[in-house]
Amino acid sequence: FFLGDGVDDFAQAENFIRRRDPDALMLDVRGNNDFCCPNAPYYRVTDFGGVRLYLTHGHLERVKLTRSFLYERAREEKCDIAFYGHTHEPDMVTGVPMLVNPGAVCREQMAMLEVEDGRPRVKMLVF
């Protein structure tokens, strides 16, 4: 998942991921600096292996001030995990919903979600 701010960064991450898993699900959302793609959504709710995900850049949920708006939005959408960006700092808060910021691809940081038997596992990666 690409969480906004930089189409070039998304291409770099996609190449890295495709080498590991050619069938990986790739989704993106628009960030506050993605002026080139006005049709891209600001958030998505999707199902991955029986796990419900909320994907957002995070600026509309004001994640630089607090994660509580993000937490409430993910709960409203009945999501198990909320992935967000905007701060460009890796972060993971366990619970339901789990909150995950993979960091910044330009700093060679990302998170990988694996689901087995409906149980999610998130790994923070540096490449």
Where are these regions (language model features)?
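Active-site neighborhood of phospho(di)ester-bond hydrolases with catalytic His/Asp-centered motifs
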Residues: 1-5, 27-32, 54-57, 80-86, ...
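Core catalytic region of metal-dependent phosphoesterases/phosphodiesterases
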Residues: 1-48
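Active-site environment of divalent metal-dependent phosphoester hydrolases
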Residues: 7-11, 33-38, 61-66, 81-94, ...
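A generic structural signal for ordered secondary structure
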Residues: 27, 94-95
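Active-site-proximal segments of metal-dependent phosphoesterases and phosphodiesterases across multiple
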Residues: 39-77, 105
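Short, surface-exposed charged micro-motifs
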Residues: 45, 91, 112
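Binuclear metal-dependent phosphoesterase catalytic core
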Residues: 49, 72-77, 95-127
